[in-house]
């Protein structure tokens, strides 16, 4: 009698489900043991029953030891995978940069009028348009720099004019002060001279009173 294929779904009957669990559990534990012995493999098996009971098998000294080995292996695989990803990313970036550099070199040569033999009319037209746009940007930048330089020169000129004006005013004020001091000194000197030239006239009567001789005495120091 041919045994029918068991449908893979949850067994609704609790008794049948428990019987099936026991049989399959024992078979699984047996297979794990055979695999570890026949193939010299490290096997760890953990089973929890529907009621939460633990069943386990380990070909090594303990399941935690196998689990620790598993976790370490997972970490190593993750690190290797990350390194491989980084290496592949670096390769992709290097390849992309090399393509960009090559494209820029070709474009530069074409702008210099080199390597145009294999260019089509459309490519030459695009190159001409690109050169026109570049020239417009260059002219605009040049005019901007000229305007800025002109403004700097004008500002410098204004500063020089202002400084010159200040110096002129300062010189004029200093000149007025000198003239004032000279005028004051001259007035004082004139007063001194007038005082010195004031004469004390002494009448010397030599002879008759009708004929008088005035003698001028020099100013006393």
Curated annotation (Swiss-Prot):
| Induction details | By auxin.
One example of a Gene Ontology biological process annotation:
flower development
Question: What InterPro entries does this protein's entry cite?
Answer: MADS-box/MEF2_TF, MEF2-like_N, TF_Kbox, TF_MADSbox, TF_MADSbox_sf
Q: Which keywords does UniProt give here?
A: Activator, DNA-binding, Flowering, Growth regulation, Nucleus, Transcription, Transcription regulation
Q: Where is the signal peptide?
A: none
Any idea where the K-box domain is? Answer: 87-177
Q: What does this protein do?
A: Transcriptional activator that regulates root development by controlling meristem size and patterning of the root apical meristem. Regulates auxin transport and gradients in the root meristematic cells via direct regulation of the auxin efflux carrier PIN1 and PIN4 gene expression. Binds specifically to the CArG-box DNA sequences in the promoter regions of PIN1 and PIN4 genes. Involved in the regulation of shoot apical meristem (SAM) cell identities and transitions. Promotes flowering transition and participates in flower meristem maintenance and determinacy.
Subunit details = Interacts with AGL16.
From the Swiss-Prot or TrEMBL record, give the protein name: Agamous-like MADS-box protein AGL14
Q: Which species? A: Arabidopsis thaliana (Mouse-ear cress)
| Gene name per UniProt | AGL14
